[in-house]
Amino acid sequence: MSKRRVVVTGLGMLSPVGNTVESTWKALLAGQSGISLIDHFDTSAYATKFAGLVKDFNCDDIISRKEQRKMDAFIQYGIVAGVQAMQDSGLEVTEENASRIGAAIGSGIGGLGLIEENHSSLVKGGPRKISPFFVPSTIVNMVAGHLTIMYGLRGPSISIATACTSGVHNIGNAARIIAYGDADAMVAGGAEKASTPLGVGGFGAARALSTRNDNPQAASRPWDKERDGFVLGDGAGMLVLEEYEHAKARGAKIYAEIVGFGMSSDAYHMTSPPENGAGAALAMVNALRDAAIEPAQIGYVNAHGTSTPAGDKAETQAVKSVFGDAARRVMVSSTKSMTGHLLGAAGAVESIFSILALRDQAIPPTINLDNPDEGCDLDFVPHEARQVSDLEYALCNSFGFGGTNGSLIFKKI
């Protein structure tokens, strides 16, 4: 069967550098870091004392105070970004089309903050002190659940939780749901709020986080010799995907087309990639095959680029193996240098950055890349954004614990 074309018609975002898509994008092109000291719990006993936090967040105009008390912050972030995306798309939900519109929204961890709070209540006061809303306030699929209820969406509702690849996997699979005719539109993306005592402590115990407490804004430095781990980030990214003819018929604004989606597994280690980046390479190869294009046609790669010693080198090797001679020409940058790592929301916000790069013909920089590490010798767009003129395809990479990999390819339209 022939696949239907899938386009992006709406965008929504909360990030450490902005509470809307456009404010975030403006900050990224200016090379602004959103990393700051953690101020919502005492970090004196923690090795890492900073993260990429969502700032000045208020959702009272979208979610009542009563309902907010029944939701972890990641759910609130996801709902707000989802509402932004739906409003941006102009998609009207009616009784006639509601069964053809769905949601695919994930999270890497889910409601960690309220899990911690309810466990504390259990320990201090016994099971009677656990909130009756504990389960629906924390489980991963509740962003999709709330948005489908708010908008009356009766199409597919799924939530893929694949660690840091969750965002890309939800977007890619939402696109396939549309491509194969099971829906005409989907809200897709990811949401995360892991800057909690257990989140910061857990990743810190694994020695995965940077400990550059004297200069947090310089801590996320992908491919730099002095990198010492990733920086946690909070936020959400949501996209409205539509079948091309459906979008065109209603006169929708079209940002880009999703032309390729690839997945793979490392089958190597729980938390580390193989040095040759074979799993990451396979995801990119599968996405390129799905898009039916050659590697040299990709002008920009929004890299996973987490600022970890092993991960950055492995992704560099993966790009070299997939792109061959074209690897020296493709622009590769890590927006995590500014936002930190949004875990299950990373692939969603970075898909949006890839789409905006196509729209504005502008490549966001990799900040803090002062001294590239040995073997990290691609065009990483250091320090400053770059204006281009002929960018047609952008590729977005996400890789996660457990060796799960995903790549999306977007085309300017």
Regions found by a protein language model. Give the residues of each.
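ACP-dependent fatty acid/polyketide chain-elongation machinery
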Residues: 1-67, 245-257, 352-366, 411-413
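Short glycine/threonine-rich loop-to-helix capping motif typified by GTGT followed
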Residues: 268-277, 306-323, 342-349, 379
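Flexible, low-complexity linker/loop segments at domain and module junctions
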Residues: 1-8, 95-98, 291-297, 328, ...
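Glycine-/small-residue-rich "gating" segment that lines the acyl/pantetheine channel
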Residues: 124-131, 172, 176, 180, ...
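Conserved beta-ketoacyl condensing-enzyme motif
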Residues: 8, 29-162, 191-202, 295-311
